[in-house]
Amino acid sequence: MMEKMILGRYIPGNSWLHRIDPRAKITAVMAFIAIVFLANNWLTYALMFAYVLYLVLTSKVPFLFFIKGLQPIFWLILITLLLQVFFTKGGTVLVDLGLLQITTLGLANGAMMFCRFVLIIFMTTLLTLTTSPIELTDGLEKILAPFRLVHLPVHELALMLSISLRFIPTLMDETEKILKAQKARGVEFTSGKWSDRIKAIIPLLVPLFISAFKRAEDLAIAMEARGYRGGKGRTRFRLLRWRFADTCLLISLAVLSGLLFWLRS
């Protein structure tokens, strides 16, 4: 189960996407998530899938990683799809089950909702797979820099977001280990009464919380040992430099947005 958790993992590489400035990648992903909702016909969705597929293939990250990125939210996607299919009224009725009806409009809305999930997950997965934790932190800090004017602790906030994101796969791996250890002791998580299943989760949560606090403490000690004192006076080994390729990425996204507006039905 935990091997399916891809969000938060970084795959080292030397593709052009790995070399893109993290500020450009973060901005592009945020903008892409916003323009996903501009698509309202199959031509616009086909255009967006072509754009994402190009980025995925040129990132040189195995495509299987992106498929695995969908698996943790499979049930959420399925439930959303079924709600759209059965409760959307309009179009031609294909199946009439009394209170529930399957219509052509419901199927179309369900398929489009599925496409939106896939596009958003692929883009966010692409961001974390091609951006190292340090780059992600620096990129977020630069983007949030204007908020320093209102005395927002930008550096600490960016670091917190980056660490939280990177801790997701670590905690999931830890959960997998504890789960296997509990099963080896005869604990059943998938059978019996619901009350028994809930009680069985407690031996899983307690060591998980202890492990999370221990890892957080170890990380804090390691950062202090390296002289970390927050953003004040901090120097960087690698400085972010905006390049022509970064501008091209944002221009391509602007062109995509313009095409989506033009092709909207």
Swiss-Prot record:
GO terms for cellular component: plasma membrane. InterPro entries: ABC/ECF_trnsptr_transmembrane, EcfT. Keywords: Cell membrane, Membrane, Transmembrane, Transmembrane helix, Transport. The keyword Transmembrane applies. The chain crosses the membrane at residues 29-49, 63-83, 94-114, 117-137, 143-163, 243-263. It is found in: Cell membrane. The keyword Transmembrane helix applies. Signal peptide: none annotated. One of its GO terms (molecular function) is transmembrane transporter activity. It is a multi-pass membrane protein. PANTHER family: PROTEIN ABCI12, CHLOROPLASTIC. Forms a stable energy-coupling factor (ECF) transporter complex composed of 2 membrane-embedded substrate-binding proteins (S component), 2 ATP-binding proteins (A component) and 2 transmembrane proteins (T component). May be able to interact with more than 1 S component at a time. Belongs to the energy-coupling factor EcfT family. Transmembrane (T) component of an energy-coupling factor (ECF) ABC-transporter complex. Unlike classic ABC transporters this ECF transporter provides the energy necessary to transport a number of different substrates. This is Energy-coupling factor transporter transmembrane protein EcfT. It comes from Listeria innocua serovar 6a (strain ATCC BAA-680 / CLIP 11262). The lineage of its organism: Bacteria, Bacillati, Bacillota, Bacilli, Bacillales. The gene is ecfT.
